[in-house]
Structures are given as structure tokens and as C-alpha cells.
Amino acid sequence: KFIDTGLGMTADEVEEYITQIAFSGATEFLSKYKDKTTDDQIIGHFGLGFYSAFMVADEVHIDTLSYKEGAAPVHWTCDGGTEYDMQEGNKTTVGTEITLFLNDESTEFSNEYRMREIIEKYCSFMPVNIYLSKENAPQEYETIDEAELRDDDVIVERIHEDAKTEEKENDKGEKEVVEVSPAKDKVKINKRPVSLSDPEPLWMKHPNSCTDEEYKEFYRKVFMDYKEPLFWIHLNMDYPFNLKGILYFPKINTEYDSIEGTIKLYNNQVFIADNIKEVIPEFLLLLKGVIDCPDLPLNVSRSALQNDGFVKKISEYITKKVADKLTGMCKTDRESYEKYWDDISPFIKY
């Protein structure tokens, strides 16, 4: 099941955004987007991606309740054919719930660890929090200070801890009882779910608000490389296209390490693929980094690109930023430039 706490949908909206694309306008819709420019991208069109569910499921149910006043809950079912059933449902909370009845070839997606692997690979930095819960798992608990209690916490028990005291000798050599820990009011609550995603990755922040330690920690987290990078470039461009990212120059030990880097490409904080050569100049594939370009012209396969002219501009921009960084270092920080020469010389020579 996929459950959200969003706006939900009315019956008319389910009909418009889910049903019509599939059964009345699929051919026209695809024809409309064929050979169009980047303004008419097919990827990300609301409702279309939903139908990939039938690649793994024999049957799909949607239960939704709109936030709109007086809206009735909707229950929609389809087995992937040309017919569907829609009637009033029994959902009582605003949002949408999608249930997949997996086919025999796709039972791997019912495995908790496989799902965690997929989420962490593709959705680690989605702009919403993603939680993974196992049905019928035993309830876990945690104890927190009462002052830390949130409105959505489920309280199991309230706990009062008396102040702790010790007998100590004062300056006069007399014994006296002193308080070493004040009384505390605590609460035992249902354990809070832990998000698998970070909605505000470092590359989305302004470079001036990021510390060196944050850059290094992000590098360790994303690339599982505990050798510190030499330096990095924070990309932050809004015009003529939207592109953000961080490129790291790793220390290259050609004797022991592979000299192939990893540059992860994202679209609206969703992972697309590693090392797409149409976007990343080949000589920069020694670097490690992340690049997020919402304007990237993806086609239906998501990993392939269209519109070579636009992609070429992105590639040229990235190359220029790397060249500017190395040129600036040569002019203003000659000592570091010479110290890192063995590691940066492949880029200079190119």
C-alpha cells in the first residue's frame, strides 16, 4: 500500500486525472506529446505514472477522500483491462491510499528490505518525507521528556521521575544533601516513524549557508567514501535553466582505487541514473557528485535524454564551472593547486 496525507480527490477528479488518461485519451495523449519540445514533457504528467502500477500488479485499488467540504470518499478498482469500477468508499481521513495486488512475478516488492533498497536508491532526497512500515509489526515505544511531546504523538504512559540527590561535603566540611538532577516529567509514546528521505538535501541550500563539515558529511553519506574530498563546487543556477548540485574532487589513488567516479543525476530530487554521458562531460566522470536539473528533457524511459541542444548547454555550463574553479585556485591559492596537482592534473590536461 502507498498512503499519503495529501489533498485527496473527489470522484470527478479521479475520473479526470486517473480514468480519462487510461481509457479515453491514452492514444491522443501520447500523440500530443510526440516530438514536442521540453515545454511538453510527458514525464511527470499527473496521473500517467500511476499506470506503471499495472506492470507489477494484477489489480489496483484507490481509496481517496478529498479535503473539500462535503466530499464523499471514493473507492476505485481496476484489473488493468478496459473497465473499472468506481463507487463511494469508506475512507475517513483526507488523503489517498493505493493498494497493489502484486502479480506472481513481482512478489519481491512485498519484501521490506527490497522496498527499503528501492526507496533509498531512488527517493532518498524526495521533497516529502517517506516512511516504510510493516503491517502487523509489533508496536515499539520510546520515552521522551514531556516538553518534547508533539500533537501527533500517541501517549502510552506518563512517567514522573523524582529529583536525584547525593550527600556531599560542603566548604565547611559538613555533610549536606544536594540535588544533582531535577525532577522530570516524561512520557512513553508509540515510537515515532523515521523518514527514509531527506526533503532538504545539501545541494538545494544556498552555498553560503553550508559549512565545510556539512559538505564532507554529505559526501560520506552519499558515496560511502570516508576519505575526505579535496574540495568541491556547489552549482546553483536558475537561468536560463534550473540546475543545482555539488561536484566533489576526490583524492585519486591510482595504485589502489578505481579512477572512475560517480555523478548521480536527479530530476526534482528523484534519482534518474549514474554517469549519464550526455549531461556529464566524459573527462569529468572522475568526479563524484550530484546534479539536479528539473528542466532536464527526459523521455518515457527516464534514463534516456532528448533535445540535444538543451543537454549540450547543461554540459557546457558544468564544464565552465569546473574550469573556473581550477583557474581560480591556480591564481589565488597556488599552494593548494600544487599540492593537489596529481589529483587534478587529469582535468587540467584535458
List where the protein language model places each region:
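Extended, well-ordered alpha-helical scaffold/bundle regions in very large, multi-domain proteins
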Residues: 298-336
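Cytosolic catalytic regions of ATP/NTP-dependent phosphoryl-transfer enzymes
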Residues: 61-69, 73-145, 178, 191-208, ...
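A contiguous, basic/glycine-rich beta-loop/short-helix subdomain that forms a polymer-engagement track
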Residues: 335, 339-350
